[in-house]
Regions:
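Short cysteine-rich loop/turn motifs with clustered Cys
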Residues: 2-48, 71
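Histidine-centered catalytic micro-motifs used for acid/base chemistry in nuclease
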Residues: 45-58, 62-73
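Flexible domain-boundary/linker segments
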Residues: 27, 70, 84-88
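Generic structural signal for short, solvent-exposed loop/turn connectors between secondary structure elements
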Residues: 1-2, 59
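Polybasic, low-complexity binding patches
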Residues: 60-65, 76-119
Length: 119
């Protein structure tokens, strides 16, 4: 899968928000707003990156179920943590704010990744 294909896959699986243009605005797994055009832009509060749910350092790869769009500060905050991780950015209304929260990868995805990676 090319980098562009990974980007498109992740965007297409990010959370669609009713009332917003799904082709340009979505939310990440932590509920932070992301703008499609801001991919890779760490100078934007709406910038985002491709996250590996099961980190590469632990043996993860570009298996599609292991990829998702994540606001860049949330991706940095998550780092190599799995299955529990911390976010740094949350949405409040139609804006992003700095706010930490704890998340756990859902059980069904953990099971699927465990089977795929034989962990």
């Amino acid at each position: 899968m090319t980098d562009e294909e990974k980007k498109e896959y992740c965007w297409n699986h990010a959370q669609i928000v009713e009332g917003y243009d799904k082709d340009s605005i979505r939310k990440d797994a932590c509920g932070a707003w992301i703008f499609k055009a801001h991919y890779g832009m760490r100078d934007s509060v709406f910038g985002w990156e491709v996250d590996h749910v099961f980190p590469v350092i632990l043996g993860g790869d570009d298996f599609t179920k292991n990829l998702r769009a994540m606001q860049w500060k949330n991706n940095v905050s998550k780092g190599d943590d799995y299955p529990e991780y911390m976010s740094a950015i949350q949405s409040e209304g139609n804006k992003n704010i700095e706010k930490e929260a704890s998340y756990t990868v859902n059980d069904s995805l953990q099971q699927e990744l465990s089977e795929y990676y034989n962990k």
